[in-house]
Amino acid sequence: MNRKIDYKINENDTGKTVEGFLKEHGYTHQVLVRLKQTDHGILRNGVWAYTNERLCKDDLITVQIVENECSDNIAPVNLPLDIAYEDDDIIVINKPFDMPAHPSAGNHDNTLANALMYYYGSQNKPFVYRCINRLDRDTTGLTIVAKHTLAGGILGNAVAKRAIHRTYYAVCSGCTPTCMRISAPIARKDASTIERCVDFKRGEYAVTDFIRIRYNPDNNLSLVKLRLLTGRTHQIRVHMKYIGFPLIGDFLYNPDYTYISRQALHSGRLVFTHPVTGQKMNLISDIPSDMKSLF
């Protein structure tokens, strides 16, 4: 996907090199190399610029990201998309349950990647699929997809620095504590390719905070709001099971389908800095009816 970005140089940036300025704005070495190989990739006041040139006040730096390739081996499939937000750099999807984020064995034409390949293909726009905060197949809610390499790199770095703040909602079995921090390392379970467990010897550092929003004594279920301080695979599901309040409907960790047919987990809020504009993004998705109806 193609993107043109303009930067007006102010007094604070005077004297910096073009490369130094762009690196401060999140351009990696890989992106800069690609721009150097692109016609009109980096312009200074409308003229081809070398990255070692020094900037002057009121210079106009224009970057042209050109991506004509598409993701390999992802078939475009016309699937419903609930778009929570979209601009030239990112798209945020409110993902339904029973939709994997990525193709895998047995899931070649029913994923979010397939849906987005069709969505952009129908607009004659080349598209490389870059999912930033991947959700499990049956987890609903907000997930960010970058539309070009610059946005993907900046947001990927934000994930590594824990600068994307994620709020989840879950329905758990039992009456949870009013609030709690769970700090317990997570590792892959022996003899399993997908299941995780708390393991204080082999596990990776993992921290989850939660507060209980509601409790229904009629069905002995709690609605909790959770904040991830780390991003381990199945972190919420494993942590809540570990403290004795597993998510209902979870086929791996608590296959109790009395009240719901899928794991009761929803990505309800994302707060992050926009990768290009620097704007603070605060996106919210309502708790779905299959969870809300239990309270």
List the model feature ranges, each with a label:
Residues 50-54, 225, 262:
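Short, surface-exposed secondary-structure edge patches
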Residues 1-36, 81, 200-207, 212-223, ...:
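Pseudouridine synthases involved in rRNA/tRNA modification
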Residues 1-181, 185, 290-294:
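RNA pseudouridine synthases
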Residues 99-102, 194, 221-222:
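Short small-residue beta-strand/loop micro-motif enriched in glycine and branched aliphatics
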Residues 147-149, 174-177, 191, 215-217, ...:
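Short loop segments at secondary-structure junctions
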Residues 128-132, 196-198, 254-256:
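Glycine-anchored helix-breaking recognition loops at helix->coil/strand junctions
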Residues 42, 65-66, 190-194, 207, ...:
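Short Pro/Gly-enriched beta-strand edge/turn motifs at strand-loop
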